[in-house]
A protein has these predicted regions:
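Extracellular glycan-interacting surfaces
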Residues: 2-310
Length: 310
């Protein structure tokens, strides 16, 4: 029988934003239609999820929690102030757009991905954890799929055209695909996946993979073949649900693409790097990102400029 965990949320507060100057002209090495552009991304992003714990009684903290490894970020589709943050030690929630955070649930699981394709369904996948919520993250159930060589899932995404199609990058193994909503998986590609830390599926059928060794890769045939789009380590990817031509990538900072990932430009340089990144479904101009300097960032203009929340 599936294990379920109850969780509570807190009331929101107003958010203040400190302006952050964008990087002057620090480009990233990119590939756009065969032409190289510069990008220097080098951050290890891992996304996390948590299992079997309750956050009741935990106090709120101002700013990002002081905890190792920020991994994953998810924005509530109907309320852009409600956020989930996956870390190495559990799941945190914010009700005020990232100004305050509270430990919530799932302590002890190193899940490295959060995905909410549509409605109330939320997926959590990572190191020795694979879970699903049907109520927006209030309760969770374990998923034990057939066909995966292990539950060390470093990259995970859901096809926006069909929520039954899932992709999982299994560390040291390859890219696996499910066509039945996660009940079973089969190998889609042994060319990528072993070192992938971020996956994104686009409505036009393409798959993007951020690889530790090969950079940002793109497949237009379900993973059968790949081409390099970024000559750099890309550890975080986010596709704007309202405008899938607008994408964000994180690493040594934040980069923006407005042509579906074919070309990129640096919009914020962060010496300590950035990890989790996410768009708000209810506001296509709003995006959030987590800096490894324990700073939470917000963009209100479609990812072009960023400010520190606090």
């Amino acid at each position: 029988m599936a294990t379920k965990t109850k969780r509570r949320r807190t009331k929101g507060r107003q958010m203040q934003v400190r302006k952050q100057r964008a990087a002057p002209q620090r480009p990233w090495w990119l590939y756009a239609g065969g032409a190289a552009a510069v990008v220097t991304l080098a951050v290890a992003l891992a996304l996390t999820v948590f299992h079997g714990g309750s956050g009741s009684g935990k106090k709120e903290s101002a700013g990002l929690p002081d905890t190792p490894d920020y991994h994953s970020l998810l924005v509530n589709p109907s309320n852009s102030q409600k956020l989930m943050l996956g870390t190495h030690v559990g799941l945190y929630v914010s009700s005020d757009g990232g100004r305050h955070w509270r430990f919530d649930a799932l302590s002890g699981d190193d899940a490295m991905n959060l995905a909410r394709p549509a409605g109330a369904t939320v997926w959590l996948a990572g190191h020795q954890v694979f879970m699903k919520s049907g109520d927006g993250g209030t309760t969770w159930s374990d998923v034990r799929p057939a066909g995966l060589p292990s539950l060390d899932i470093h990259g995970f995404t859901v096809d926006p055209r069909n929520a039954s199609i899932l992709y999982a990058a299994v560390a040291g193994q390859g890219l696996y695909r499910s066509g039945d909503g996660g009940r079973s998986f089969s190998l889609a590609s042994d060319q990528v996946g072993a070192n992938v830390m971020a996956l994104a599926a686009l409505p036009d059928g393409r798959i993007l993979a951020g690889d530790m060794q090969q950079g940002l890769l793109e497949s237009s045939d379900g993973g059968a073949s790949w081409k390099q789009r970024l000559r750099a380590q890309v550890m975080g990817l986010a596709v704007n649900p309202s405008n899938p031509r607008r994408l964000l990538a994180t690493g040594a900072g934040i980069a923006l693409s407005t042509d579906g990932g074919r070309s990129w430009r640096s919009v914020l340089d962060l010496p300590d790097g950035a990890g989790p990144v996410a768009w708000a479904r209810s506001n296509p101009q709003l995006a959030y990102a987590v800096g490894f300097n324990r700073t939470f960032y917000r963009s209100a203009d479609g990812g072009k400029t960023w400010g520190a929340v606090g």
